[in-house]
Swiss-Prot record:
Residues where substrate binds: S254
Needed cofactors: Mg(2+)
Protein name in the entry: Ketol-acid reductoisomerase (NADP(+))
Free-text function comment from the UniProt entry: Involved in the biosynthesis of branched-chain amino acids (BCAA). Catalyzes an alkyl-migration followed by a ketol-acid reduction of (S)-2-acetolactate (S2AL) to yield (R)-2,3-dihydroxy-isovalerate. In the isomerase reaction, S2AL is rearranged via a Mg-dependent methyl migration to produce 3-hydroxy-3-methyl-2-ketobutyrate (HMKB). In the reductase reaction, this 2-ketoacid undergoes a metal-dependent reduction by NADPH to yield (R)-2,3-dihydroxy-isovalerate.
Binding site for Mg(2+) 1: D193, E197
Gene Ontology terms for molecular function: ketol-acid reductoisomerase activity; magnesium ion binding; NADP binding
The family this protein is said to belong to: Belongs to the ketol-acid reductoisomerase family.
Residues annotated for NADP(+) binding in this entry: Y26, G27, A28, Q29, S52, S54, G135
EC class (word): oxidoreductase
Cofactor mode of binding and number, as noted: Binds 2 magnesium ions per subunit.
Origin species: Helicobacter pylori (strain ATCC 700392 / 26695)
Superkingdom field: Bacteria
Source organism phylogeny: Bacteria, Pseudomonadati, Campylobacterota, Epsilonproteobacteria, Campylobacterales
Enzyme Commission (EC) number: 1.1.1.86
Keyword annotations of the record: Amino-acid biosynthesis, Branched-chain amino acid biosynthesis, Magnesium, Metal-binding, NADP, Oxidoreductase
């Protein structure tokens, strides 16, 4: 099923330009979105808690910084650009008690709304505006007069403003209309995003890379060669896949590599498909969200243990040496 797609010519930038936007958070996304809004002639202010290390940075870049509850009381559109696991705590204390009918609260990911961590009052709009890329890329592409694909979704309508028109206009201010703004739902964005991260982009890729590296090491191959073949060259293939697609990738590799890929895909594909279906099921039934929020409540014991252990692995130790020339050039 094809999603509706909107471009600059379809979207009225004046909608968001007529409203006061408040951005909660000034991390990578918050900074990039605030700067893009300003360059798109949109009024934007930043909301941060007292003592935040980001206050001086936001002020240095010319933004007015308010406490979160004050920002909420003086904004038409409030963008919650915080880590997913902080939404419930921050919004319940600093945002929801101060909302008025007609305001709109926006999110860059559907997690907290879809999994009922955040429930907004009736008459307050809930929109999703999700750039398909990190904050650094969002800003860089905007400055090059290009943009990233954006997803928008409407979970709840505003009693005053047209939530869809606001979401589209906001995405245009981000540069999204230059590339394409696709309309979806909070559910679809959230579940597909989590699945992509876990099964392919982060979890899946890391598992394949590490297992490949360890397989070669165990078989007696030098660590340097194992790293080159299983880690270093991933970027070359990923770039081809990004710009050329699967067929284009096939056309740019040798017959040996293509035939080997087909042979390897057959046994690996069957196993991966079953595992991926289980991963998706746990996302859909809320098991993953429950586990993640429990992890947060315990102050991230699993994450902290994994991060510490990763530093001691052979793949990281040899990788640090081999990456040094590239990092030095930067």
């Amino acid at each position: 099923m094809a999603l509706p797609v909107y471009y600059d010519k379809d979207i009225d930038l004046g909608v968001i330009q007529s409203l006061q936007v408040g951005i909660i958070g000034y991390g990578a996304q918050g900074e990039a979105q605030a700067l893009n809004l300003r360059d798109s002639k949109v009024k934007a202010r930043i909301g941060l808690y007292q003592g935040s290390l980001s206050v001086s940075k936001a002020k240095k870049e010319g933004f007015e910084v308010l406490e979160v509850k004050e920002l909420v009381q003086n904004s038409d559109v409030i963008m919650a650009l915080l880590p997913d696991e902080l939404h419930k705590e921050v919004l319940e204390k600093e945002v929801i008690p101060f909302l008025k009918e007609g305001q709109i609260v926006g999110f860059a990911h559907g997690f907290s709304v879809h999994f009922n961590q955040v429930v907004l009052p009736k008459g307050v709009g809930a929109i999703l505006v999700a750039p398909k890329g990190p904050g650094s890329a969002l800003r860089e592409e905007y400055l090059k007069n290009r943009g990233l694909y954006h997803l928008i979704a409407i979970e709840q309508e505003s009693s005053i403003h047209n939530a869809k028109a606001v979401a589209l206009s906001y995405a245009k201010a981000m540069g999204g209309g230059r590339m394409g703004v696709l309309e979806t739902s909070f559910k679809e964005e959230c579940e597909s995003d989590l699945f992509g991260e876990q099964a392919v982009l982060c979890g899946g890729l890391e598992a394949i890379v590490r297992m490949g590296f360890e397989t070669l090491i165990k078989a007696g191959y030098p660590e340097e060669l194992a790293y080159f073949e299983c880690v270093h060259e991933v970027k070359l293939v990923a770039d081809l896949l990004h710009y050329k697609g699967v067929e284009g990738l096939r056309k740019h590799i040798s017959n040996t590599a293509e035939f080997g890929a087909i042979k390897a895909r057959e046994p690996m594909g069957k196993l991966l498909k079953k595992r991926m279906q289980k991963i998706l099921k746990k996302i859909q039934n809320g098991s993953f969200a429950k586990d993640f929020l429990l992890e947060k409540s315990l102050n991230y014991p699993r994450l902290n243990t994994e991060r510490k252990a990763l530093k001691e692995t052979k793949i990281e130790q040899i990788g640090e040496i081999l990456r040094a020339p590239f990092n030095h050039k930067k």
